[in-house]
């Protein structure tokens, strides 16, 4: 199996615009398509991007086409519990074998993985940071292992580092924050402002090279505290 041959990435959503298209009310630009396709290419996978509107029949037809010419499919959007989140039903209609549905963390909890005709399909949240975080944590390790480039486990090295900035919100469940690590320290963008860490926020991701892990039940964290850091691999 030449697993890096082609990896297609399909974004769903009738509200999405391609870069360069004129913005209109109710529309958003397809940040996920650019961001995550670039990351997959950076890790050595050949990627072709596709977009599909919110039409179950069209999504079924596109996935059937994609699965004939690629080794794996990664999608963003259409996977939660909204009225137009059709991917779980679409996968069921394709006879998909579930691998898992949902992850106990924030962001990215709606993520699911399945196999269709033996090929991996990963469905990520449509929120940019949620998609980026789960791509790093789950998708890349699985694809690298399938390609014979990773023996087992997660590719994100874990270290303990000291916070130079805090985070003002308690974490009921496992939470992952974008952050910037340097030496033995790590900084959380936004000076502890929880609003800067919305799963839909892009600006706070600029320059980030790791995730800070806050376990379920954690309270707010302050500068000087030691935290677990998962560093991105390049």
Feature annotation, model-predicted:
Residues 9-12, 75-76, 104, 123-125:
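Short beta-strand segments
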Residues 14-15, 78-81, 126-128:
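Short glycine-rich anion-binding loops that position phosphate/pyrophosphate groups of nucleotides
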Residues 2-7:
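Short, small-residue-biased leader/transition segments that mark boundaries at the very start
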Residues 90-234:
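Flexible glycine/proline-rich
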Residues 35-86, 90-95:
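N-terminal small/polar loop signature for handling phosphorylated ligands or for N-terminal nucleophile
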Residues 9, 40, 74, 179, ...:
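Residue-level signal for inorganic ion chemistry
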